[in-house]
């Protein structure tokens, strides 16, 4: 009997191609779309009514059943709520990480296993593997370096990886579009989504005010000597590396270096001051066997960043220190630092501060 796979369908070409690939491999495939929003004023965003309708049409075209799993309350609490609390604490979160952990490979996987499915699958550009020597399931980068999404999956557990199939990760984006076009899928040329789904216009301040009831509190811009340079509009309006929209007159370009929630200040400096050679991080997730000694890796602190050689040193309390061979620009509290050993994702953590 064919193994049963539940595919998370977003309405996009990658998840549709995922269905086609799994069908070719002989799996019994069903589709599911996660409802993330009750409202209809966010067309074209992940989990929207438009996505649900399109996913249903594409599923029917491929001859697979399709259902909708309502996770609106969980999404509001664990993703949108966490986004608000992190911003209010002076950090810059990546909500896609929370969505993958809590919804796609949390609630969706639990539902699938409870309803007789053997695996779940998504259209992520990453791969899964198994290391017989350690007995551990592995996460590997996708073969398309330009589309690789392993960075946002570093929190995967062994249980999740054991029930995960990622066929799209074996292909390039052009190959995936060609596969969908050959089948005649309506979404073969659908553009990739870019924005945070619940802040599609990029106005974080408005979202924090309307959803989180956050009223930004103005405070001081200061330099590294403590000198006040001007007034800011509230910590939530800024992130490390930002230059535009500061409203500060100076004889040189100024950038946001960091934010201090305790004192409600934003530290400004020149571009050279944005570079740091080390960081501290917590909430560590290891996919490989957790190391007891310093581990040589390549690492990156942003999704689109190139990796750099580094050493990860385990600390007391489950934290890590990461020392880079070359200084890194705009290391940002709240973002993820992800570690690689070749193509294998070793693990990752949430950045606490640059050193």
Residue ranges and their predicted role:
Residues 1-155, 165, 174-175, 181:
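ATP-dependent adenylation/nucleotidyltransferase module used to activate substrates
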Residues 39, 121-355:
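AMP-forming adenylation/ATP pyrophosphatase catalytic core
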